[in-house]
Amino acid sequence: MVYSYTEKKRIRKDFGKRPQVLDVPYLLSIQLDSFQKFIEQDPEGQYGLEAAFRSVFPIQSYSGNSELQYVSYRLGEPVFDVQECQIRGVTYSAPLRVKLRLVIYEREAPEGTVKDIKEQEVYMGEIPLMTDNGTFVINGTERVIVSQLHRSPGVFFDSDKGKTHSSGKVLYNARIIPYRGSWLDFEFDLKDNLFVRIDRRRKLPATIILRALNYTTEQILDLFFEKVVFEIRDNKLQMELIPERLRGETASFDIEANGKVYVEKGRRITARHIRQLEKDDIKHIEVPVEYIAGKVVSKDYVDESTGELICAANMELSLDLLAKLSQSGHKRIETLFTNDLDHGPYISETVRVDPTNDRLSALVEIYRMMRPGEPPTREAAESLFENLFFSEDRYDLSAVGRMKFNRSLLRDEIEGSGILSKDDIIDVMKKLIDIRNGKGEVDDIDHLGNRRIRSVGEMAENQFRVGLVRVERAVKERLSLGDLDTLMPQDMINAKPISAAVKEFFGSSQLSQFMDQNNPLSEITHKRRISALGPGGLTRERAGFEVRDVHPTHYGRVCPIETPEGPNIGLINSLSVYAQTNEYGFLETPYRRVVDGVVTDEIHYLSAIEEGNYVIAQANSNLDDEGHFVEDLVTCRSKGESSLFSRDQVDYMDVSTQQVVSVGASLIPFLEHDDANRALMGANMQRQAVPTLRADKPLVGTGMERAVAVDSGVTAVAKRGGTVQYVDASRIVIKVNEDEMYPGEAGIDIYNLTKYTRSNQNTCINQMPCVSLGEPVERGDVLADGPSTDLGELALGQNMRVAFMPWNGYNFEDSILVSERVVQEDRFTTIHIQELACVSRDTKLGPEEITADIPNVGEAALSKLDESGIVYIGAEVTGGDILVGKVTPKGETQLTPEEKLLRAIFGEKASDVKDSSLRVPNGVSGTVIDVQVFTRDGVEKDKRALEIEEMQLKQAKKDLSEELQILEAGLFSRIRAVLVSGGVEAEKLDKLPRDRWLELGLTDEEKQNQLEQLAEQYDELKHEFEKKLEAKRRKITQGDDLAPGVLKIVKVYLAVKRRIQPGDKMAGRHGNKGVISKINPIEDMPYDENGTPVDIVLNPLGVPSRMNIGQILETHLGMAAKGIGDKINAMLKQQQEVAKLREFIQRAYDLGADVRQKVDLSTFSDDEVLRLAENLRKGMPIATPVFDGAKEAEIKELLKLGDLPTSGQITLFDGRTGEQFERPVTVGYMYMLKLNHLVDDKMHARSTGSYSLVTQQPLGGKAQFGGQRFGEMEVWALEAYGAAYTLQEMLTVKSDDVNGRTKMYKNIVDGNHQMEPGMPESFNVLLKEIRSLGINIELEDE
């Protein structure tokens, strides 16, 4: 296997057995591809902005003598880059400019004669752009648009499963759901009549819609029924016989023909009878006259002599009618064929309850139902019905909807019109009737073939279209009103509605969410999340059990494990590792094709619908070297069921064992040994891990760590291969390889790293280089680690030495006992950065001012501020300290004579302003690491703002000139090469100053051309530098675009280091979470025979009942990994020769039964082996992929190689007494995470604070600085103890007795510790409530 330079530094031993046929795809492609589709120009006009424009334009005036046509659009360049947008708190977006053409036609001239054409580019608002990592920066914060899983447009057949009515009768229904437009439902009622609803309104008989489509009763019956023909011959009644129709009936008369009796009266007609009738080719049989009574005629019968209607279509025949028909010469009578078994008379019955009889009455009925209370006119009724389903403006099935519609009705073509046709409606009714007749099945709406993914691009396009439609109305008005000769396209378009619609979607849609930025995994998972909630989706309250449950079609598409606990369970899911969406938005998953029993490496992506037709083998089926299945019977999935199939029947095979799960779950080693509930918690808690100060790769991983770290975008990844030319903490410079350069460029790539910035969750984002000078790199290599990554691998926590044993009750109920060593080594120390902002506004009484001159504040409080009133960088501040001094003008108040006197003597200033400074919130402390000042255009900048500006300018200039130097050096080395090869002597050349080199001329014409080209490039480079510097300078010095009424914003960033402490929440990766109960001195911790103490003691009782055995296997394997690291460490310390080291490491990598990983250390240089060994000293990292992990025997082998007991248990001694514990204890290395539930953020105390307005009781919660609720049960407890005075105190002066509590405060001040309880305010509230019910209630003072 070929390793890149970064991977060679530390190779993870892989226990996976199954070959990797398909690499893990780019994990953010669902976001990036979707948005790309939205903004890139699509010549077909199927997707994105292009589709939205084409669907709305051309806009015609009402008179039709002018129209506004769309030509093309382009997106401009964003004003600020992503970082600048985040700092300034603005949206990262690009201006949309659209070329429109106004065409004016001649009025009097014939149709289509053009009078005038004006073309112009019009600004249509800003479109937020996606960053490279799949996020949007909206108002300075990173947000993610979550994909939505919604019901696909199309037609669905369903039933109520017998729940609607007490009789338990199953009522079937059909629903046509368009992408946009009105829903059309058909449903049966108890009496088997068919009804229709439009947009879930009042139901009408279904035949109304057919009449509105201009069908007569005869035509309606013709569409839905087969006919039975009776003929009257020689006063006898003959019936045309179709034998198949008789099956299962009981003969009500002898069936005979040609003198032979086929079925006797009262006998059941069987298949044998039918065969005989068919064999003898019987076409007619004689039936008794009574047989026709009760049959329904299929058309109108008129007496031709008089023109009188004898019987109308859909009338029941009686013997009288039969006689009349016979007399008037109708010898052939057509009736409807119905029976109770599979040809129900539903439509015929429905026609009877239908009150309408022609098209107009049907349209009026529909109009009345849609617009109750409005008087219907013919035109209004017609246009309403036309617009409902047959107008492209109002109704669109979309390509997906049409495809699903046609598939559902078993039609061959999958393309068609976006609106409904007559045939569509009739075919849906026919299929519904077939289902009611017992032919066909209802659909399963939870099947992933019936639910599709709506991603960012599509949702943004819909919002954009909404904005355009609003503009369309305005444009139509303008075209009709204005003087067209002077109008230009830009006078008609108002960009406000468009940008408002887009802004609203990105800013406040339920699916536009504040990005979860705890760590790289939480970012990736958030972008791959799939929600069934949101506009057009489900709501939590209404979603039942079925929607939330795991469906067989989720396999390989949606993760069955990763979903939140709580009310959203099952509604918010995560995309599986290999899943992607197809052109229609349905999820598909890859499979290996199986041809003639041989598994090939050909990969097909199948959607849930396609998958149903195949037999698919599991990824862990055993194959021989040729790719044949070893066993005769293979476990496969087919049609949603798992069972055994013979190997010849298999069509496809899974690509990978981790195909089923999401990225989060695929990072849990030994997932296959964990109970599903705990695996769910494990997958969810990894997302809450806080990045530690020093990331530490997991000793036991799954091999997915690298993919997540690289794809998440938190690391710096090489765009092209080359060598490291320069590296420091904030930038890396790569000299690009010759073969990867574009012609005529300097061949230098510069990577600027992010330093100590704040994430959305207040954790710290910081990148650190992990390459050194002169090192070669390849494209895709990790150059710098971000938060929670270690040498390009995801590293969410720390490897801790754990023991499973009780320890003095300190690990009761999942508590965790931690050694002091963990605190000393800063293993779980995290940095948190908080942003505090102070806004200075323009008030009615005058502007607020940022200043150090604050009334009534002592010197000490101002000691950390500079003369502008802003805190110094580096100041250590605690709760209540002033960060930014600010005063607000105070209204003129009535002054007492004394105050007037004081003001007269001491001047004005002190009392007409009040202190409104920004202070550090209670319970927060830290160091000021950055201050930013934003000043409105036209407001004078203060000293601090100018200092910051100067510093930024200096920094920008320094960065750019360094960049220029690096690029220049690259260019000049190429110029030198050309000159030397052109015959200039190297020594003489080096004596010349570099600027003069370009003046030299070469005789070789080709070389001279090259030189001139390089000279041009040099000029261009300098010009570019000037331009960049000027742009930077303009950006830094220009005023900021602040919200209306805001003059200045000062942002202060506080950083705080948080060590681990009792009350912090920790967890493993298997759902084993707990709270730290005690930090124990190192000397008291249990230790082993070598005197090594354990770091963490966990409760063994947390394992059996929770059934997450994965943590035990992880602990054993971690022990083995560490053991091998210890042996390598010992060899390095003894300075053994490289050959021995190489041999031992090779042995470790080769261990395990037929593993897929082949590491050949003989191809590594000695330096590379030494570097590898150096990185393996702390333990050899191991990958045990999900469902394909290390087996027990392999763990034991590895333990043996590390000279450790194969039981995984060792003897421990008590740190306090030195006595041996009575039995061996499981000790090993587990990867522990510190979760973002820190005691510092939760602990809180109140003495006095704010009170609720109505009840006057203290508020609750830390945010409101609230108190602890003394609830109902606590009151019972005090009652039970008989502690009456304590209880009285709790319910009065400590809660809502307003007078009592002020009195008590005064008493305490006076040193008199008495209390006088009064009436609680909430009792008064109760009195008022009762009075409001009309019951007078008064307290009598006795």
Curated annotation (Swiss-Prot):
E.C. numbers: 2.7.7.6
Pfam families xrefs: RNA_pol_Rpb2_1, RNA_pol_Rpb2_2, RNA_pol_Rpb2_3, RNA_pol_Rpb2_45, RNA_pol_Rpb2_6, RNA_pol_Rpb2_7
UniProt entry keywords in alphabetical sequence: DNA-directed RNA polymerase, Nucleotidyltransferase, Transcription, Transferase
A molecular function GO annotation: ribonucleoside binding
BP GO annotations: DNA-templated transcription
Reactions this protein catalyses: RNA(n) + a ribonucleoside 5'-triphosphate = RNA(n+1) + diphosphate
S-S bonds: none
GO cellular component, one term: DNA-directed RNA polymerase complex
The UniProt record lists the keyword Nucleotidyltransferase: yes
CDD domains, sorted: RNA_pol_B_RPB2
InterPro entries named among the record's database cross-references: DNA-dir_RNA_pol_bsu_ext_1_sf, DNA-dir_RNA_pol_bsu_external_1, DNA-dir_RNA_pol_su2, DNA-dir_RNAP_su2_dom, DNA-dir_RNAP_su2_hyb_sf, RNA_pol_bsu_bac, RNA_pol_bsu_CS, RNA_pol_bsu_protrusion
Coiled-coil blocks: none
Enzyme class: transferase
Family: Belongs to the RNA polymerase beta chain family.
Function per UniProt: DNA-dependent RNA polymerase catalyzes the transcription of DNA into RNA using the four ribonucleoside triphosphates as substrates.
HAMAP family reported for this sequence: RNApol_bact_RpoB (MF_01321)
SUBUNIT field: The RNAP catalytic core consists of 2 alpha, 1 beta, 1 beta' and 1 omega subunit. When a sigma factor is associated with the core the holoenzyme is formed, which can initiate transcription.
PANTHER family hit by this protein: DNA-DIRECTED RNA POLYMERASE I SUBUNIT 2
Name of the molecule in the record: DNA-directed RNA polymerase subunit beta
